[in-house]
Amino acid sequence: MAVKNMTKKQVQIFFERLREQRPSPKTELNYSNPFELLVAVTLSAQATDVSVNKATDKLFPVANTPEAIYALGVEGLKEYIKTIGLYNAKAENVVKACKILIEKHNSIVPNNRAELEALPGVGRKTANVVLNTAFGHPTMAVDTHIFRVGNRTGLAIGKNVLEVEHRLVKVIPKEFIVDAHHWLILHGRYTCIARKPKCHECVVADVCNWPDRFEFGAARSIAVKNIEAEL
């Protein structure tokens, strides 16, 4: 059975519930300024936040500015991030990005997409994370967790990440859009997981359109039926 798109009311309830569950959502990457966030997100491609944090917890006390990391050089940076996947390419990209930040941006992380995506190793998703998390832009970075949640629940159905991103930006109410990335990624990481999703403990199971949710423990309660009737 195909998943149906959520109604506006379902979307509203969906995010009200996620907000109640996590009033102040935030990234699980450790950072203290926009540059540290940029580096951490760049390193996080095809790596876990836990593995990135282990590396940056040692790196940032030593080098957390473009000048300091550029001074380390590629080989020096590798020593700090060699436990992370694709560390060779990532080290080269980060050092090149630092050089550009120093020469073109006075060592300040740009607050716009075009200049961010011009940095080596920075694609649309990384730019979206930095714009949203560091600068409060209403952008939506779609990773594997958010792609799954969007398609599974009916919140944002799309064949690729760009389709899901555009759909999310379109349907999410303005009051939720700035925090939506964090809510969705955390929901996908801990509840709406790829295998054996925890529908039995999901706070939005009653507004989810995934046909199989009841097989994974979503309650068929009177409250659920009442909400579904309202929708």
PLM features: what roles do these ranges have?
Residues 3-228:
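Catalytic cores of DNA base-excision repair glycosylases
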